[in-house]
Amino acid sequence: MNEERWNRREILAGIAAVAVAGGRMNAEGAVQQRVLGRTGEKVSCLGVGGSHIGKPKLSDDDATRIIRQAIDHGLNFMDNSWDYNDGKSEIRMGKALRDGYRQKAFLMTKFDGRTKDSANQQIDESLRRLQTDHLDLLQFHETIRFDDPDRFFAPGGAAEALTAAKQAGKTRFIGFTGHKDPHIHLYMLELARKNNYQFDTIQMPLYVMDAHFRSFAKLVVPEAQKMGLGILSMKSMGSGVILKSKTVAPVECLEYALSLPTSVVITGIDSQQVFGAAKQDGAGGQ
């Protein structure tokens, strides 16, 4: 079998692998749900990572099958971004969410524009690619430099675009992401308080080695909890670097992130590591 093509059994194996971690499937065989912070929305504890969906190793049909099979088995949280794979990730997800699947999904995307004008342009482009008139969650992407929070809240900055998008009904909820330094996240939250600006979600890397260096779990998660934010976890496997040590399995990495007060752990269900774990754990037939 061509390793770059996924059939129905393999897709289900991947879903099963991430869902069985810690008993994350309910009695009906669907992935369990968690509450997304103060929004009160119920979302799947595992999310489909949009970055993987647009990669060349997958065809458009592969991407559609993965997304729809995931939704059919309770993974309703869809992650994406304006800049993933030059827009291909959003285009593929938009096609996959036709035929009634958009109504079953909790759809999130992100934008990179630092100014109001550039952000507005990217938001509208994302809506067109995703073939929808609104998002469930829209996030400011890659808060990774210490001046990013200042730029976000500056006059004419992206904060104005995010607020306008919510007021116009282009998104139900708003948040921000970053993966570089927990102190940048904390500074963003500090400026949000000073500006009386209310985020609904916060996204950050949470993985097994996090506690040893620039720990988001120790520094940011408690603050996010105090503010009632929905906590989104990414990079649970350290972009694959952690797995190269062969000291932990993919499912163990996922279980660590799920053990934290996260609402959603975003992962690439099409990855070789996940499918390998499914076969190893005997979950392929479930």
For the regions a protein language model found, what residue spans apply to each?
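N-terminal binding-site loop/beta-alpha segment at the start of enzyme catalytic domains
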Residues: 2-105, 161, 167
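Conserved, mostly hydrophobic/aromatic
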Residues: 36, 48, 78, 93, ...
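Acidic (Asp/Glu)-rich catalytic clusters
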Residues: 37-40, 94-102, 127-132, 191-196, ...
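Conserved beta-strand positions in the central sheet of alpha/beta enzyme cores
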Residues: 47, 77-79, 136-139, 175, ...
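Active-site mouth loops of central-metabolism enzymes
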Residues: 51-60, 110-116, 244
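Short, acidic/polar
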Residues: 58-70, 117-129, 182-190, 250-253
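Active-site groove signature of glycoside hydrolases
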Residues: 130-148
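Beta/alpha (TIM)-barrel catalytic core signal, keyed to glycine-rich beta->alpha loops juxtaposed to Asp/Glu
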Residues: 143-286
